[in-house]
């Protein structure tokens, strides 16, 4: 029977080791074997279970409720992400920034960055992106909390093994989304730094020798696609984000 370390499982299942530990310790979802030195070892059944947990979470089930669903073999797929958005919105409206930070941190420990970005943070930010001053203020608070939290996550990830990369926004206007994409990349094994300002004219030769992860927004233009491919054909170490 094949056995895998937590790092190997993280790569196989595309999930942060911190999240795997939280699923085990806090929620009892996983029961890995242990080496004599106390290191976790997972088998193929554990990997299947992790993927099943991810499926439930992607459908909006709170982590605390997944264990019951796993034991019941239920095929129901509820979508609870709207409820999670409302909880986050409540914290924003309460102006209790300490509680808001703690809630975001807990979600970050319980869920993969990609899942949170796709199902929670991006949809709620879209709801807040309007001309109403009150909602604009809430969006500003949320963005500040997110960037601060992500910066801490990236700093922690840089202490681990991985390949260094610089995240760059090319002709974008949503800087917070750039940080979210960098956070997702950091959970895929990259050690990330973020160029804080978007570049309207992107010249990769200015970053010679660096691996560049480029975010062009949700709707990458054909010209951008062709230019990125041309740079890669020239040997530039450039990778598009979010595609």
Curated annotation (Swiss-Prot):
Top-level taxon of the source organism: Bacteria
PROSITE patterns with a match to the protein in the record: HTH_MERR_1 (PS00552), HTH_MERR_2 (PS50937)
Annotated keywords: Activator, DNA-binding, Transcription, Transcription regulation
Molecular-function annotations in GO: DNA binding; DNA-binding transcription factor activity
Every HTH merR-type domain range: 3-72
Entry-linked Gene3D superfamilies: 1.10.1660.10
CDD domains (UniProt xref): HTH_MlrA-like
Purpose of the protein: Transcriptional activator of csgD, which is required for production of the curli (AgF).
Name used for this protein in its record: HTH-type transcriptional regulator MlrA
